[in-house]
């Protein structure tokens, strides 16, 4: 372990100790205490990004995007609370007391700090690793063929899934996708195959020449996918598809210039307005949907950044709600949800009425039933750490950070080695779903998408 890594790890440990000392000395929740925790959060995310920058020399990489997303979803409202800017219609204070939020804040900071410490410990600079030219050329050919195969196989299921979603949204609105009216026959099988469509496009993107017609066609398809996502009322996958495209260009083609970043920032502001409008209008009619988006953006009272972060930050809800149920009403899981998630590799061949993973590892469904809610609240990595290990959940987050770094860090995955870069951006594409879900989704992403692609390419290279 080099001196820089030791200093970064020590700085994070010291920082979280200071946060906890403040929390312990001011155990009675007050508005000032909540704001102070928000300030600690600002400092912690800045320290995390700065430490990653000085350790790796890069900042706009898959791991950093995942880390920022984790903070925005798990701590976003606390960031805004420092400035009294939380959108009232999204505020967690409508469901929880100051004391509930205060406890959730310190727990979230501890877990996210542990996650990043795990990543720092896992980081290993492999920039000097050289891939043999003949192996790299074989990987290009194999990945290109694999991309064509995945796109051709997933195309029809992808189209079917999206047409069904469009019909449901047009008929029942956004909520129809998640209610009884949104049930799709064989939806799981179709969705599993359809989800290979974008990874297939990413295979083709990485093996196409920059500026070529094939690359431009792929970006046009990405744009159409994003429009379809927004029409259906979704946003997360559209945002991450944009982020993956920028990651590809910045880390695989050539670094983006300062002028380019300015242009992207201006475009990002406009995109935030659109995303905020989508969130506001997605429950309504689709008759004049895109015209309504334009009209909503002209509202001077709308601040897209505040609206967007307020909604993202409401994902602290599962943690705060779980803390009110466990351990008072139900006991801790002691790692069982992680173990049951791993059993999802075993198909249900009639041994069970419901697969054990579906019963014990889908914690969003558990929370919906335990809290007697009429809608699915989702879940989070931090909430799952709590329900399993309580105050010691940070240990699970440290281990998770270690392995997430191994997958997401493109230096540790040998820079521009095409296979490992491909796996990193596929994981990034799937990662926003993971932040707002339980561990079982991470297992499924690895099992159904990343491992098959990895082992297929490695097997073909060795032939």
Regions found by a protein language model. Name each.
Residues 177-184, 272-401:
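Small-residue-enriched transmembrane helix-hairpin modules in multi-pass membrane proteins
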